[in-house]
């Protein structure tokens, strides 16, 4: 099991990205969350089987057709009890 945290920069708020990533996170049976940050970026924390977390990373990089990534920061993150993949407000 692995846990990753990504901070997404660019046109990432107000374009349906959180909902898009939640749907994929649930389908991949991941735990974690996605949320908007005050600086206009989006934070994603995903925990699960390594292959499934890497698949979510691929989905993040592809975007939803409305988002436009300018930068992505990635780091290992502590394993936690995040529950099902959800949107945090």
Curated annotation (Swiss-Prot):
Q: Which domain of life is it from?
A: Bacteria
One of its Pfam families is: Acylphosphatase
**Keyword Hydrolase belongs to the record:** yes
- Please provide, alphabetically and separated by semicolons, the GO molecular function terms listed in this UniProt record: acylphosphatase activity
Its recorded reaction(s) are: an acyl phosphate + H2O = a carboxylate + phosphate + H(+)
Recorded E.C. number(s)? 3.6.1.7
What keywords would UniProt list here?
Answer: Hydrolase
Q: Which residues form the Acylphosphatase-like domain?
A: 3-89
Gene3D superfamilies in UniProt: 3.30.70.100
Catalytic positions are 18, 36
Q: Which family does the record claim for this protein?
A: Belongs to the acylphosphatase family.
Q: What is this protein called?
A: Acylphosphatase
- Organism listed in the record: Petrotoga mobilis (strain DSM 10674 / SJ95)
Q: What is the lineage of its organism?
A: Bacteria, Thermotogati, Thermotogota, Thermotogae, Petrotogales
